[in-house]
Design a protein with these regions (language model features):
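Non-heme Fe(II) oxygenase metal-center motifs and adjacent flexible, charged/small-residue loops
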Residues: 1-138
Length: 139
């Protein structure tokens, strides 16, 4: 399947002025998705951070890395992530997402949930530095 197969029709999953979700089913074929997961696991210099919840410091049950302009950072829950420059393969993926979506993306938080015990509870990504109504692409 061509990555930009014109048969891909976005499906709107929510109403306007709420969390708007557009879903492109089968945007990647299984082989390409498997390659991207493998490359992510092996090539990203993953961070393991801790978070303070109800007075306890615990490891965040996932690994993560923040990509973007190296002069920028992202802070949530008192965790400051200094941006790492996009590797070429993630930058190419970002460009493909921009073409498909018609939107621009300048940074990426990449998460690695290692197994069934890694997870993050329901939460709001409402940091002011993300701006009003931030746009998120999720793969």
């Amino acid at each position: 399947m061509d990555l930009f197969d014109h048969q891909l029709i976005p499906v709107r999953l929510t109403e306007e002025r709420q969390s708007q979700i557009t879903f492109w089913p089968n945007w990647f074929d299984g082989e390409r998705a498997d390659r991207l997961v493998s490359q992510s696991i092996n090539d990203i210099d993953w961070r393991s951070d801790v978070i303070r919840i109800v007075g306890k410091t615990i490891p965040i049950p996932r690994l993560q890395q923040w990509f973007g302009n190296p002069e920028t950072s992202y802070t949530y829950s008192n965790i400051r992530l200094q941006a790492v420059a996009f590797p070429c393969w993630i930058d190419q993926l970002r460009e493909q997402i921009e073409i498909q979506s018609g939107e621009r993306f300048n940074r990426a938080l990449v998460n690695y949930y290692r197994d069934g015990s890694d997870s993050v509870d329901w939460h709001a990504d409402d940091e002011t530095e993300l701006g009003f109504e931030p746009l998120v692409a999720s793969l």
